[in-house]
Regions:
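C-terminal and inter-domain tail/linker signature
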Residues: 1-119
Length: 119
């Protein structure tokens, strides 16, 4: 599987499986960095994805670029929270058929405020 094929499984989990990452090949020590949360292992990330995935109402990969084992995706997504649609960039690194690292980049100010207000 190419890095892009592995990453396609990851995005399919967001698009059609409500964040269920059980079939996604995340390395056990998968590292994720984002504006709202950071994770240092696959199981913690999977738990967050299941919770967040239940609130995602729209998720579209607008564009993807590959550079060796890195896949950069531009994503448009919406959540069942009182926030505007969001656009983000995500960089995923793949080694030996597993996603080892992810970095999500977007302006999370509105999302953090909605989460803090308990909406």
């Amino acid at each position: 599987m190419s890095p892009k094929d592995v990453v396609a499984l990851y995005y399919d989990a967001w698009i059609s499986k409500r964040g269920d990452m059980s079939a996604v090949p995340l390395a056990p020590d998968f590292k994720f960095r984002g504006p709202v949360a950071n994770f240092d292992d696959a199981e913690s990330y999977r738990a967050m994805a299941r919770e967040a995935g239940a609130m995602v109402t729209s998720f579209t990969v607008r564009q993807q670029f590959t550079d060796g084992n890195r896949v950069c995706s531009i994503i448009d997504w919406e959540m069942a929270l009182p926030v505007a649609p969001m656009t983000s960039a995500e960089i995923l690194e793949v080694e030996n058929g597993q996603i080892t690292r992810g970095e999500l980049i977007y302006d999370a100010q509105e999302l953090r405020a909605a989460m803090a207000a308990g909406r």
